[in-house]
Regions:
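Alpha-helical scaffolding segments of alpha/beta enzyme cores, especially the outer helices
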Residues: 28-35, 39, 141, 145-148, ...
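Conserved glycine-rich beta-strand-loop-beta hairpin in the small C-terminal domain of fold type I
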Residues: 119, 123, 139-147, 158-171, ...
């Protein structure tokens, strides 16, 4: 970050837990990031869409909770992703008043509001999030199955997902991400995401969702 910093740098965008790798940033790393942001007077937009789906007792730390960060952090949370209400298209942000004033003065007129039914569904989910316990049990079991399956295939490997209902699969020994993706669609009629849209390091990887609730999924 120090090497990338310029006089024009105003903001850092962070995804934690990460999409697509599922990595959860540890407290020590977040503390260093917070110190960097404070030192250089930067705003941090922190996407925490999957904050409620973290496995194996890994500690999830909200960046805004660290010293000096509340007044410079925009926390983005997603009902659609975090609570498995994908079709609702509902998210919200949490930030200090001075940031919210700027937001309401610009973004609201562009983004608009979601429909009433989605808002009511989101409110119900936030008031009683007890279903997340079962939701995470299901996905915890599935991620272990997915991990075993992909690591048993010659030329394919993946790390155990730390969060979310995603897995980041390394297929670089089989071909490019686009080639493997096209093969899977043709041979199995299954859609996955090639890793290339996620940047140069996404080449040779596939982003796969194991989030369907059907038992035969």
């Amino acid at each position: 970050l120090e090497k990338r910093l310029t006089p024009n740098t105003k903001m850092i965008v962070l995804t934690n837990p990460n999409n697509p790798t599922t990595t959860v940033m540890r407290r020590e790393s977040l503390e260093k990031l917070a110190q960097f942001a404070v030192k250089n007077d930067l705003i941090v937009v922190c996407d925490q869409a999957f904050e409620d789906s973290v496995y194996d007792g890994v500690e999830f730390v909200t960046l805004a909770s660290l010293p000096g960060m509340w007044e410079r952090t925009v926390t983005v949370c997603s009902i659609s992703k975090g609570m498995a209400l994908s079709g609702y298209r509902v998210a919200y942000i949490v930030a200090d008043d001075h940031i919210m004033d700027v937001y309401y003065g610009s973004a609201v007129s562009v983004i608009g509001a979601t429909n009433t039914a989605s808002q009511l569904g989101a409110i119900a989910a936030l008031k009683d999030a007890s279903f997340l316990e079962e939701y995470n049990r299901i996905f915890d079991r599935r991620r272990k199955i997915v991990y075993e399956i992909f690591n048993s295939i010659p030329g394919v490997s993946m790390a155990m997902p730390e969060s979310t209902f995603l897995c980041w699969v390394n297929v670089s020994r089989l071909g490019t991400a686009d080639e493997v993706n096209a093969y899977i669609i043709k041979e199995a009629n299954v859609v996955v995401n090639a890793g290339t849209p996620y940047g140069a390091q996404g080449e040779g990887h596939l982003r796969i969702v194991f989030g369907a609730f059907r038992e035969d999924a």
